[in-house]
């Protein structure tokens, strides 16, 4: 009976998504200073690679109309 309780407790601990890294490493700057390290990129961000802490390097999407502006 003890083994069953022990196995249940261990499986519950392993099932949880325990943070391996500190919370300070979540919003680190990556991508030559233009992006952020996140567990998952937000809906308005592109994933451009991986951070040293194995999280995704997320770059904010930009409005293409701002890039193609021409002065009259």
From Swiss-Prot:
GO terms for biological process: defense response to bacterium; innate immune response. InterPro entries: Beta_defensin_dom. Residues 1-22 form the signal peptide. Disulfide bonds join 30-57, 37-51, 41-58. Keywords: Antibiotic, Antimicrobial, Defensin, Disulfide bond, Secreted, Signal. GO terms for cellular component: extracellular region. It is found in: Secreted. Has antimicrobial activity. Belongs to the beta-defensin family. This is Beta-defensin 104A. It comes from Pongo pygmaeus. The lineage of its organism: Eukaryota, Metazoa, Chordata, Craniata, Vertebrata. The gene is DEFB104A.
